[in-house]
Amino acid sequence: MFEVNPVKFKIKELAERTQLLRGIFDYDAKNERLEEVTRELESSEVWNDPERAQALGKERASLEAVVKTIDDMDSGLEDVEGLLELAIEEEDEDTFNETSKELDYLESRLADLEFRRMFSGPQDASNCYLDIQSGSGGTEAQDWANMVLRMYLRWGEAHGFSPELMEVTDGDVAGIKGATIKFTGEYAFGWLRTETGVHRLVRKSPFDSSGRRHTSFCSVFVYPEIDDDITIDINPSDLRIDTYRASGAGGQHVNKTESAIRITHLPTNTVVQCQNDRSQHKNKDAAMKQLKAKLFELEMLKQNADKQAAEDAKSDIGWGSQIRSYVLDDARIKDLRTGVETRNTQAVLDGDLDKFIEASLKSGL
């Protein structure tokens, strides 16, 4: 005979968690808004304004993620109760096992929704940019920056964030000096915002004929793409705009043209670059959008008492602002903020970062 009480307890627990989320996410208001948005999108007039239609489509997807999950939980738990009753009546172990599997599936759906609670920041739902900058250390540090670039590109691809390499600057011998990736998708910034900081590598350098261990640093800075309705005043006289020939590592990512743009905001010494289009005009527009996003995030950081260190992390590549240590010889990667670590170093370098990201988000970093 199978154990019924644990299953009944889990059904009750999931129902209570669902009810709690119903209040936290303001289900009734979201459901009402979803109906309004759906009606508007079904109107032919909305397509006269493609930007408005796109924004509504994005809002509908966000609303559906909450409303549909809660609806599915309600109906799913009701179905599971029916299955359990049937299993008990007929003493059918196969039906009971099916009940347990369905409960596990519903719990995973609920856990996903609970995880979304951590994306409560005003910009968390936005697309984002991720800057990578190699630290001092020459070729070894530049190779490490390239490994970090590959790691985040793999992570973005695995999560459907359509990573786009906006700019990459080759290293002197190997690797890269710096790069910028754009991640497009719901909660891209929410997922990546705690990755800002310094990433430290310890390994036997392939560039050292003596095979000595080297320590290298690479900084990461994440900032959200901002909506057009947020006004950022930039004085044109504060900008220095340079054009150059794109020469990115791994030419499959970047067009090798004369149209690359570098914009420097002189008062803050903030630099953005774009070289992913053959059109200089399009690259300039993309770089200006990126500059506004970066200046906006820097201003937000300044307004928070504990954010000065995060701003410093953009340029201070050293011991003080480390967030994660990658010790390859010992097969150990450890997050210095949460204590989470793994020995599967290759999986992490191939983009398996969720264990670290989820722990940092859950700890409220």
UniProtKB/Swiss-Prot annotation:
Query: Could you tell me which residues carry N5-methylglutamine?
Result: 252
Places the protein is found = Cytoplasm
Query: Which InterPro entries did the record assign?
Result: PCRF, Pep_chain_release_fac_I, Pep_chain_release_fac_I_sf, PrfB
One GO location term (cellular component): cytoplasm
The Gene Ontology terms for molecular function here are: translation release factor activity, codon specific
PTM entry text:
Methylated by PrmC. Methylation increases the termination efficiency of RF2.
- Keyword list, A-Z: Cytoplasm, Methylation, Protein biosynthesis
Question: Where does this protein chiefly localize?
Answer: cytoplasm
Question: What's the superkingdom here?
Answer: Bacteria
Reply yes or no: does the keyword Cytoplasm apply: yes
Q: Which PANTHER family match?
A: CLASS I PEPTIDE CHAIN RELEASE FACTOR, PEPTIDE CHAIN RELEASE FACTOR 2
Q: In which family does this protein belong, per the annotation?
A: Belongs to the prokaryotic/mitochondrial release factor family.
Q: What does this protein do?
A: Peptide chain release factor 2 directs the termination of translation in response to the peptide chain termination codons UGA and UAA.
Q: What is this protein called?
A: Peptide chain release factor 2
Specify the species. Shewanella baltica (strain OS223)
Q: What is the lineage of its organism?
A: Bacteria, Pseudomonadati, Pseudomonadota, Gammaproteobacteria, Alteromonadales
Give me the gene this protein comes from: prfB
